[in-house]
Amino acid sequence: VPRVLRLVAACALTVAAVLPSSAAAKVPQGFFGVMVDGPATETPGILEREAPRIRAAGAQTVRFAIDWASAQPYATAAEVPEAERARFTDVDGVPTDLSRSDRIVRLLAAQGLRPLPVILHAPDWAAKFPGSLLTDPRRYASPPSGPEPYARFVAALARRYGPTGSLWSTVPPQRRRPIRTWQVWNEMNLNVFWNEPDFQEGYVPLLRATRAAVRAVDPRALIATGGLTNGSVPAWTALRRIYEAGGRGSFDVVAIHPYTRSAAGVLATVRATRRVTAARGQRTIPIVLTEVAFSSSGGDSPDARRFATWDTTERGQADRLRSTFRLLARQRRALGIGGVSWYTWLSPQARRANWSSYAGLSRLSGDRIVRKPALLTYRTTVRELSR
């Protein structure tokens, strides 16, 4: 990580030196978004209360996770315990429970928000490294054993939530927000999400199979790569490996998670990513930042020292958010930036948690939700930059 961050910092100095001073250009509808996870989606009642606030903050796209392992934990109906059978329906021969994602998609659509799902986590029956998370840490990070079960699952999601999806049959037309973009996995260049060397060897077939399966349901659907982040392998190098493994043509959107110390560093990662796509003849393929954030632990997080480059105070978090959004809006056309989502809406912020637990625009404090300075800054900056 330190070497990657030094590279980003060096590029950022160049970026900062050439930035125009003119006001940021306005962005189209859907450009700004936010992630909902953790307590926002897992604690009963919170998303019901927070979805209107997300809309009021100016977010137009909301990214959320669909956990494949939770939706399809059993390979066959015979494996389902009798006490659980009522919650499953048969989908392509696999017992499936979509109640969690149904709830989230309905809540977001009711507020006029665009759902952006990231689909990850292989169930044991479809995992390359099956086994309990408690006894085998690879379980959480295991890639699928093959691409087809995952591709069939995402195609089933498209039949449920796409333009002709069955979910919308009871929803008034004006309140429908069908899903058109599907994000395949998350941060595959980190072993906490894909615990196998040379991730691209298994990931490119997954992309290709998923795109074919989803396009058979919705010919205009878009497939986004999982968010490539600046880990030990930087985002642009990970993307280059996807291309080298034959990935061109298997995705429609490049997604990145440019965690770094500053707005200029974020833009430097976007520029490096664009150089890779241009070298492969894809100068105009959209680049979307499906996560960007700065931690506000102020050094309180135990890994703040390790990730000090993007750790700051609550006030510093708000300032960096404003700078980052303005810079991305200003460079949107030149670099083909398709959107940016803040990670995350609501943090648990248990004391001395890891850095990501301080990334939210709001935080839990006991049973209360505390609004951080970054939330007001998000709202005012999005209003400033939106058409």
Residue ranges and their predicted role:
Residues A78-A83, P178, Q183, M188, ...:
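Aromatic-rich peripheral "rim/lid" segments of glycoside hydrolase catalytic domains that contact
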Residues P44, A151-R180, N195-R315, R322, ...:
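Noncatalytic carbohydrate-binding groove/subsite architecture in carbohydrate-active enzymes
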Residues A25-T61, A65-D67:
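Boundary/entry segment of secreted carbohydrate-active catalytic domains
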Residues D37-E48, D67-P73, D92-L98, D124-A126, ...:
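Acidic-and-aromatic substrate-binding clefts and catalytic sites of carbohydrate-active enzymes
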Residues V8-V18:
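Bacterial N-terminal signal peptides
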Residues V34, V62, L108, L157, ...:
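Conserved, mostly hydrophobic/aromatic
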Residues R3-A10, S166:
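Sec-dependent signal peptide recognition
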Residues A57-G231, R283:
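Substrate-binding cleft and catalytic face of glycoside hydrolase catalytic domains
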